[in-house]
């Protein structure tokens, strides 16, 4: 029988790992735990999964919502919030940090945001 394997890191490609990691540090209050040329990892004491940022000079931001023939998002992160009031507070904070609220929203249970490199992410109450 195989030993269980856990997710350790979620890595986002981007052109500038430093600026994108700085955005997530401000927004989430996480700490930088690793940095070398082209890769930065962030961690939180309350979360076992780290978020990483990897330099990819050929990175093309996804279009959201998806459009035929355009770069599609391949994965996105959902950040858990306590309730609707906490979600609204985090949306305002994310905007102040440099995110944009997506024009298309499909539920009151989550809010879709776009980070400075174009990656969609959500705050959700699920």
Predicted segments, located by residue:
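Conserved S-adenosyl-L-methionine
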Residues: 103
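Glyoxalase I/VOC metalloenzyme domain signal
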Residues: 1-8, 12-34, 44-100, 114-126
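Short, small/polar residue-rich loop motifs at catalytic or cofactor-binding pockets
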Residues: 106-108
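Short, Lys/Arg-rich nucleic-acid/phosphate-binding segment
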Residues: 36-38
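Acidic (E/D-rich), amphipathic helical modules within compact regulatory domains
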Residues: 41
């Amino acid at each position: 029988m195989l030993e269980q394997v856990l997710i350790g890191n979620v890595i986002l490609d981007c052109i500038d790992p430093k600026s994108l990691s700085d955005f997530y540090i401000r927004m989430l209050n996480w700490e930088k735990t690793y940095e070398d040329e082209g890769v930065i990892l962030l961690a939180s004491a309350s979360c076992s999964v780290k978020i990483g940022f990897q330099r990819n000079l050929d990175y093309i931001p996804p279009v959201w919502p998806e459009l035929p023939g355009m770069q599609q998002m391949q994965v996105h992160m959902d950040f858990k919030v306590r309730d609707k009031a906490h979600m609204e507070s985090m949306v305002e904070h994310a905007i102040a940090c440099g995110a944009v609220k997506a024009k298309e929203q499909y539920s009151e249970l989550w809010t879709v945001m776009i980070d400075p490199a174009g990656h969609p992410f959500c705050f959700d109450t699920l």
